[in-house]
């Protein structure tokens, strides 16, 4: 058995399942956030965290239909949220920092809406991939509620990550590929 095989076996045996073994022998984790239109969410995370080595993809999570299409999700009938899945190296960027940024770049006090976008597919949600992520998300949420949203209630759902379905190819990195097109008016830094 090669050293790489033994290392992989050891790494996958000792770490929680939400972590994956990268080709650079480092561990990566996933973070999944819903905060309105996924184009704007992806654009904001890439703008501020690409330098930290994150990779992103947009898709659908939290619904009751397998392999939903954009049209189905937009109808509101599938219960999916438009979401961003981030793969990150926790040695380069901490999960807590990604969660705090999530609250900074959208309005977590509006139920099933962000700016002009309305419907459950635009809800504010953190989909955690481990008990540790849940604990961190709850702690950061309480801190942000106290510090930034006194008098307004954060309505963000903190729920287990289920199956994430990749959105259609044309949605991936949409605002990067269409820089003079639509801008998401609800995604900006609030503090």
Regions found by a protein language model. Give the residues of each.
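Flexible coil/turn and secondary-structure edge motifs
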Residues: 2-191
